[in-house]
Amino acid sequence: MISVYPAFYKDFRCKADRCVHSCCMQNWDIDIDEATAMKYLVMTGEPGETIRTSMAGTKGNRRFIMKDGRCPLLQEDGLCRIIAETGEENLCDICAMHPRFFVENGNFELAGVGLACEESVALLLSNSTPLLFMEDSASSLFDFPTLLSAMGCSLPEEALS
C-alpha cells in the first residue's frame, strides 16, 4: 500500500485551548475504541473514575456522554482532562486522530485533514503555491494531476486549472 498525503500533513498540530471552534464543543458523538475503553475501565484513581462516569454504552459501542454539547472531559481552560492528568497516550483513537482521515483507493492510502478544523484550513491556505503531495517512501513532492495519473485516474485539463 502506498501512503500519500498533502505536503503540510505532518505539520498539523491541534490548537487545543486556542481553537475557537473546538471539536470537543460540537455536540459530536465521540466513540471510544474498545482497546482504549478497556484501559479506562481499569484505570485507577480519580482520573479513571471521572472518565468512567463520563462514558456510556456497552462493549464495542462506548462513547462519551456530551454535556451541553461539550465533551465532559474538556476543562474550562480548553484543554483535555485525559491529556492533562494521564497523558496523550490515553486518548481514544478518534480524539488522537481527528481531524486526520484515511481513504483507501486501490494500492493507495490517501491521508488528509478534515476542513471542519480551523487549523487544517489555516495550513491549507498558508501556502500560495498549488497543493503538493508526498509519498511515505519518497522524499519528492508531486502535484494533483500527477497523483491522479499514478492512481490511474484522469480529469479534463480544464478541470485541473
Task: Name the predicted role of every residue range.
Residues M1-S22, Q26-T44, A56-D68, Q75-S161:
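Short loop/turn segments that flank or connect secondary-structure elements
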Residues T53:
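Metal-dependent nuclease catalytic cores that hydrolyze phosphodiester bonds in DNA/RNA
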